[in-house]
């Protein structure tokens, strides 16, 4: 799908949280308990609960997801990331750890903007660098700015892989993604979603990569709607 087509879709579609298809419901329940194909373990959820029980898992063919072995098996939380352009604007103004750049700033520049904006772009922080343990999703076929699926609050949302974590914590997404998932919790730069019930799914392979990313959009909902057709196709291909 090219940029002009994506923007046209964005203009005629409405914002909504998407219902979970049956296969994703089954995946959510089935893979909560145990990960058999652990790519890398030893991560935290950014807090003190459940220790270093969080891991990157490859049990779903064509995908990578976050999982925790604690409490009989669970997923992870959603801390708020405000890195990138306008990192101190709006509800990001109280972010204690925000940085002015994302990990994929150079890739983003190719699409005509200086960087992702956490207030606008629903992106996911996925992968860990600089500290041990590390995990690089590119090694398993994910590509920067590729579409990701997020199961949160009993619904499905779509975003892009937009940043990595410089430490060993997991479970982080942009402010705009947190607002899509948990509007009733009123997230901001210093407050996210604490429960470990969020399933982040990254897709491997070229089908998840957009030919043109609609980064020029003015509303988060327009951005999400514009990548929905790609996300739906990717999710439909997942098997529990």
UniProtKB/Swiss-Prot annotation:
One of its GO terms (biological process) is polysaccharide catabolic process. It is found in: Secreted. Glycans are attached at residue 86. It comes from the Eukaryota. Disulfide bonds: none annotated. Belongs to the glycosyl hydrolase 75 family. This is Endo-chitosanase B. Its main location: secreted. One of its GO terms (molecular function) is chitosanase activity. Its EC number is 3.2.1.132. It catalyses: Endohydrolysis of beta-(1->4)-linkages between D-glucosamine residues in a partly acetylated chitosan. Keywords: Carbohydrate metabolism, Glycoprotein, Glycosidase, Hydrolase, Polysaccharide degradation, Secreted, Signal. One of its GO terms (cellular component) is extracellular region. Chitosanase catalyzing the endo-type cleavage of chitosan, the deacylated form of chitin. Chitosanase may be crucial in the degradation of the deacetylated portion of chitin in the fungal cell wall. Chitoolisaccharides produced by the hydrolysis of partially N-acetylated chitosan are known to have many biological activities, including antibacterial activity, immune-enhancing effects, and elicitor activity. Residues 1-17 form the signal peptide.
